[in-house]
Curated annotation (Swiss-Prot):
CDD domains: SmpB. Signal peptide: none annotated. It comes from Clostridium botulinum (strain Eklund 17B / Type B). One of its GO terms (biological process) is trans-translation. Keywords: Cytoplasm, RNA-binding. GO terms for molecular function: RNA binding. Belongs to the SmpB family. This is SsrA-binding protein.
C-alpha cells in the first residue's frame, strides 16, 4: 500500500525510519539556487544516502541529489553539491553537542514547503543494529495482526 503524500511534502527519506532511531526532529531552511527550487517542486529530489555534517560552525547536507532543471541550461548547478542549512548559531552549537555523542548523526528526513520556502526536517538519529530492525518488524507485524483481529471481531 502506497502512502499518500501530503500536499506540501516534496521528498521523503523513508528508509531512514527503518535504519535509525529518530531521537528528535528539527526544522531548518536550506540555501538553494532558483533552478534547484524548481526541480524540487517538480519532485526531482532524492534524500537516499544523504546526511548532514557540521563544519566551521555551519551545517551542510551532503549527497542529496537534485536533478538538473530541464529548462535551466546555464543556470543549473551540480546535482550532488553541498547545500547549506540555515539555522541559528545556538541551534548549531546544540546540534554539534548532540551529534558528538557516539553513534549519533544528522539525517534529512523530509523536504517540504512552508510559506513558499523549501524546508528540511533534520533528525538526530542513532543507527539501528540488525536485531533492532528485526524486532521493529516483528512488532509491526504483531500490531497489524491485533488490528486485523479487532476489526474481524467488531464485524460480528
Amino acid at each position: 500500500m502506497v502512502r499518500k503524500k501530503s500536499s506540501n511534502t516534496l521528498a521523503e527519506n523513508r528508509k531512514a525510519r527503518h535504519e535509525y532511531f529518530i531521537e528528535e526532529t528539527i526544522e531548518a531552511g536550506i540555501a538553494l539556487v532558483g533552478t534547484e527550487v524548481k526541480s524540487i517542486r517538480n519532485g526531482r529530489a532524492n534524500l537516499k544516502e544523504s546526511y548532514a555534517d557540521i563544519r566551521n560552525g555551519e551545517i551542510f547536507i551532503l549527497s542529496m541529489h537534485i536533478s538538473p532543471y530541464e529548462q535551466g541550461n546555464i543556470f543549473n548547478v551540480e546535482p550532488l553539491r553541498e547545500k547549506k542549512l540555515l539555522l541559528h548559531k545556538s541551534e548549531i552549537h546544540r546540534l554539534a553537542g548532540l551529534v558528538s555523542r557516539d553513534g549519533y548523526t544528522l539525517i534529512p528526513l523530509t523536504l517540504y514547503l512552508k510559506a513558499g520556502k523549501v524546508k528540511v526536517a533534520l533528525g538526530i538519529c542513532k543507527g539501528k543494529k540488525d536485531y533492532d530492525k528485526r524486532d521493529s518488524m516483528l512488532e509491526k507485524a504483531h500490531n497489524r495482526e491485533m488490528q486485523r483481529a479487532l476489526k474481524e471481531r467488531s464485524r460480528y
